[in-house]
Design a protein with these regions (language model features):
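Enriched for short, Lys/Arg-rich terminal
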Residues: 1-5, 9, 15-16, 23-24, ...
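Alpha-helix C-terminal capping segments
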Residues: 14-17, 45
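Alpha-helix boundary/capping and short turn/kink residues
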Residues: 16-23, 35, 39
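A short, surface-exposed loop/turn module that caps and links secondary-structure elements
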Residues: 29-53, 83-84
Length: 84
């Protein structure tokens, strides 16, 4: 099992989301990442290192330290042209 670490930037972005239902959905999706690499809806990013998971219109961008078994949640963004 992997440990999940929230970067300060990602934590601030999550707290700025107004809808409580959306926050809960994002937290539930992040909790499924502890079973890495057996996770659904995870895709590798093409233009930079890391991965993303889709939660409705939101994207959670993260990186994996495989040797340390740590997932670093780097950003939580609403999907638009500038997301990736």
């Amino acid at each position: 099992m992997y440990k999940i670490e929230w970067q300060p930037k990602a934590y601030r972005q999550l707290n700025k989301i107004a809808e409580k239902k959306t926050k809960i959905s994002i937290l539930d999706a992040v909790d499924t990442l502890v079973n890495w690499p057996n996770c659904k809806q995870v895709k590798s990013l093409k233009n930079r290192n890391g991965y993303r998971i889709r939660v409705g219109r939101w994207r959670v961008l993260f990186d994996v330290a495989k040797k340390l078994k740590i997932l670093k949640i780097e950003e939580v963004k609403k999907r638009d042209e500038r997301t990736y």
